[in-house]
């Protein structure tokens, strides 16, 4: 059973996060291992497996990038361990420039303001790519959506580096 069916949700990228959380809690209560403590071992094992599936499904559908990767995996695209070479040289150049810019921010005289501006630009790029990805997934443009997901991975890693730099800078004050 796929995760969308498990949670009683339509198999599309946009989803009702509150409904997902509600269904998750309902399923957690229904299959919590404590409810099966006095059952035979087979029942306990099945309940534990179901609880694990519920947790994994919830974490997958809850996070936008994981949800997109899951949807693509349902269509035969395995992006989880992929070593796909990015073919978009303009995008790769942009990534190199952004990483160089981020490295330079740490040594700038007005680090906080420059980092804030950089972070704002990066968030806009991520938002644009997520909107593209949503449209592509909804239109079943799987190949294009897979490429967009790959690009979002780069941007997400860069965003994590921004957050790490922010934490280091806050620690310096």
UniProtKB/Swiss-Prot annotation:
Matching InterPro entries: DnaJ_domain, HscB, HscB_C_sf, HscB_oligo_C, J_dom_sf
Keyword hit for RNA-binding: no
Gene3D superfamilies: DnaJ domain, HscB, C-terminal domain
Coiled coil: none
Keywords, sorted A to Z: Chaperone
J domain sequence ranges: 2-74
Protein name: Co-chaperone protein HscB
Species this chain originates from: Xenorhabdus nematophila (strain ATCC 19061 / DSM 3370 / CCUG 14189 / LMG 1036 / NCIMB 9965 / AN6)
Record's function text: Co-chaperone involved in the maturation of iron-sulfur cluster-containing proteins. Seems to help targeting proteins to be folded toward HscA.
One Pfam family from the record: HSCB_C
GO MF annotation list: ATPase activator activity; protein-folding chaperone binding
Superkingdom to which the source organism belongs: Bacteria
Keyword Chaperone attached: yes
PROSITE patterns: DNAJ_2
Entries under HAMAP family matching the protein: HscB
Biological processes annotated in GO: [2Fe-2S] cluster assembly; protein complex oligomerization; protein folding
SUPFAM superfamilies, per the entry: Chaperone J-domain, HSC20 (HSCB), C-terminal oligomerisation domain
């Amino acid at each position: 059973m796929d995760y969308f069916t498990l949670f009683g949700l339509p198999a599309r990228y946009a989803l009702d996060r509150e409904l997902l959380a509600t269904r998750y809690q309902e399923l957690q209560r229904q299959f919590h291992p404590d409810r099966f403590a006095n059952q035979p071992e087979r029942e306990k094992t099945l309940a534990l497996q179901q609880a694990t599936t519920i947790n994994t499904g919830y974490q997958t559908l809850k996070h936008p990038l994981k949800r997109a990767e899951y949807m693509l995996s349902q269509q035969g695209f395995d992006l989880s361990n992929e070593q796909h070479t990015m073919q978009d040289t303009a995008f790769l150049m942009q990534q190199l420039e952004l990483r160089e810019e981020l490295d330079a921010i740490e040594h700038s005289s007005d680090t906080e303001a420059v980092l804030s501006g950089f972070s704002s630009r990066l968030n806009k790029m991520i938002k644009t790519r997520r909107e593209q990805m949503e449209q592509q997934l909804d239109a079943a443009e799987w190949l294009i959506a897979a490429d967009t997901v790959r690009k979002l991975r780069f941007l997400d890693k860069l965003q994590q580096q921004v957050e790490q730099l922010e934490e280091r800078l806050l620690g310096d004050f």
